[in-house]
Swiss-Prot record:
One of its GO terms (biological process) is glutaminyl-tRNAGln biosynthesis via transamidation. Allows the formation of correctly charged Asn-tRNA(Asn) or Gln-tRNA(Gln) through the transamidation of misacylated Asp-tRNA(Asn) or Glu-tRNA(Gln) in organisms which lack either or both of asparaginyl-tRNA or glutaminyl-tRNA synthetases. The reaction takes place in the presence of glutamine and ATP through an activated phospho-Asp-tRNA(Asn) or phospho-Glu-tRNA(Gln). It catalyses: L-glutamyl-tRNA(Gln) + L-glutamine + ATP + H2O = L-glutaminyl-tRNA(Gln) + L-glutamate + ADP + phosphate + H(+); L-aspartyl-tRNA(Asn) + L-glutamine + ATP + H2O = L-asparaginyl-tRNA(Asn) + L-glutamate + ADP + phosphate + 2 H(+). It comes from Nitrobacter hamburgensis (strain DSM 10229 / NCIMB 13809 / X14). HAMAP family: GatB (MF_00121). This is Aspartyl/glutamyl-tRNA(Asn/Gln) amidotransferase subunit B. Keywords: ATP-binding, Ligase, Nucleotide-binding, Protein biosynthesis. Its EC number is 6.3.5.-. Heterotrimer of A, B and C subunits. It comes from the Bacteria.
Length: 494
């Protein structure tokens, strides 16, 4: 039975509503110093053909030897995706011709992948979450790269990437909108980065996606899908899906039919174009690679890797909510990038009372620090304010040495000039005024100077904020806001 379709996920066509059905095949480059079947370097950015072994170049007589680290990374990824780990898997030859595939086949896994079914939970922008099924994860070789801009009348081949280990992570067709697809890839990339199994750098090609899109009437049978190859940014994934769905709907509403085909996305034009008819599995003539024995390992091997897994985003989010009272939204923002979560934890480690001030620290990390970093297009690694400096600012607020307003001024000074926050507060006279006599005098002066406003506040107590603001202004932001508020209530008889 089909689940009801959310109205927000429907596309309005000329003849009625349509639903997208989306599945993704994400190719993640394994973090490893050597390639899947050779000892050649995987370093990015080398001179063309400078990281190529005889195995990678498919020289006669060269035999592949499995890199155990790549196997470990694939198993760790499978565990991070809550997936079934298969203790026996088989490498197959996927036969096709392409100039940057020197063997004439790709070593992949077909019927017996290293990782089976799993699931990840994806948080959406509207606060809802969806479970996306993982169909499988298998190991395979990457191909080389064709370069078409080196010569006017010929193409060049760079085999540096040839033989680099890829994990192909295949989702089930559980996604129903471009926003869901983008959120899924974002969450998957975050998990991979936490695990350290792929750096997720889409600009360098470390993570790229084949996007399968079909459309149907709500509740109808699945339509014919088209595959959009090698989409290399999350923004482009969303654009490619939107265009492809509209293209298919236009054809169907004009009485046509969808051809199952492979397409390419042109980011400059924001459209997809036909590349070739979509191959079926039998077109590749898969058969087990005779040069490689089946890959077998014990449950103990899996358990040892499982015991060594880091805390993953969902676990960290739950801990942040439970230990520090963060909202689910704030916790999700902090764990969304590994570096962000690490920075927040470093701030917590520097606090005098992390459990008490964890929520305050989160507010400062998200609103002040991230806000400023985004404004200046900086990554967290380039932050002028360190975790220890931000922790000191939060401590000064928590112990009521400075007010929130003064804290923002202090943050600006540390951002632009650097320095120890406590030393700066002392040197620049930024301490909060806690002398009740001085605060009371300021309150009396403001109330006496504004009798009409005082009468209005007595009639409408919620207007007391105006008086609080005036007293804070008169004190240069140094008065204790709570003390000001309490004194005003007493003086005004509220």
């Amino acid at each position: 039975m089909n689940a009801p379709v959310k109205p927000s996920n429907l596309i309005k066509g000329a003849t009625g509503d349509w639903e997208m059905v989306i599945g993704l095949e994400v190719h993640a480059q394994v973090t490893s110093n050597a390639k899947l079947f050779s000892g050649a370097s995987t370093a990015f950015g080398g001179e063309p053909n400078s990281h190529v072994s005889l195995v990678d170049a498919a020289m006669p007589g060269m035999l592949p030897v499995i890199n155990e680290e790549c196997v470990r990374q694939a198993v760790r990824t499978g565990l991070g995706l809550n997936a079934q780990i298969n203790l026996r898997s088989v490498f197959d030859r996927k036969n096709y011709f392409y100039p940057d595939l020197p063997q004439g086949y790709q070593i992949s896994q077909y019927k017996s992948p290293i990782v089976g079914e799993g699931e990840i939970v994806v948080d959406l922008a509207d606060g809802a979450s969806i479970a996306v099924g993982i169909e499988r994860l298998h190991l395979e070789q990457d191909a080389g790269k064709s370069l078409h801009d080196q010569h006017a009348d010929m193409s060049a081949i760079d085999l540096n990437r040839s033989g680099v280990a890829l994990m192909e992570i295949v989702s089930k067709p559980d996604l129903r909108s471009s926003e869901q697809a983008k959120a899924y890839v974002t969450k998957l990339r975050t998990i991979l980065r936490y695990l350290g199994t792929c750096d997720g750098d889409m600009e360098k090609g470390s993570l790229r996606a084949d996007v399968n899109v079909s459309v149907r009437r709500p509740g109808a049978a699945l339509g014919t899908r088209c595959e959009i190859k090698n989409v290399n940014s999350i923004r482009f994934i969303g654009q490619a899906i939107e265009h492809e769905a509209r293209r298919q709907i236009g054809i169907l509403e004009d009485g046509g039919s969808i051809d199952q085909e492979t397409r390419l996305f042109d980011p400059d034009k924001g459209e997809t174009r036909a590349m070739r008819s979509k191959e079926e599995a039998h077109d590749y003539r898969y058969f087990p690679d005779p040069d490689l024995l089946p890959l077998e390992f014990s449950q103990g091997f899996v358990e040892a890797l499982k015991a060594d897994l880091p805390e993953l985003p969902d676990q960290k989010k739950t801990r942040f909510i439970g230990d520090f009272g963060l909202t689910p939204y704030d916790a999700a923002v902090l764990v969304g990038e590994h570096e962000s979560a690490n920075f927040y934890e470093a701030v917590l480690a520097g606090l005098a009372n992390g459990r008490r001030d964890g929520k305050l620290a989160a507010n400062w990390v998200i609103n002040e620090l991230f806000g400023r970093l985004n404004k200046e297009s900086r990554g967290i690694a380039a932050s002028p304010v360190s975790a220890s400096q931000l922790a000191a600012i939060v401590d000064l607020i928590g112990e009521e040495t400075i007010s929130g307003k003064i804290a923002k001024d202090l943050f600006e000074i540390v951002w632009t000039e650097g320095g120890d926050p406590r030393t700066l507060v002392e040197a620049r006279g930024m301490k909060q005024v806690t002398d009740m006599g001085a605060i009371e005098k300021a309150v009396d002066d403001i109330v006496a100077a504004n009798p009409d406003k005082a009468a209005q506040v007595r009639a409408k107590p919620q207007m007391i904020g105006w008086f609080v603001g005036q007293v804070m202004k008169a004190s240069g932001g140094k008065a204790n806001p709570q003390a000001v508020n309490d004194l005003l209530k007493t003086k005004l008889g509220l």
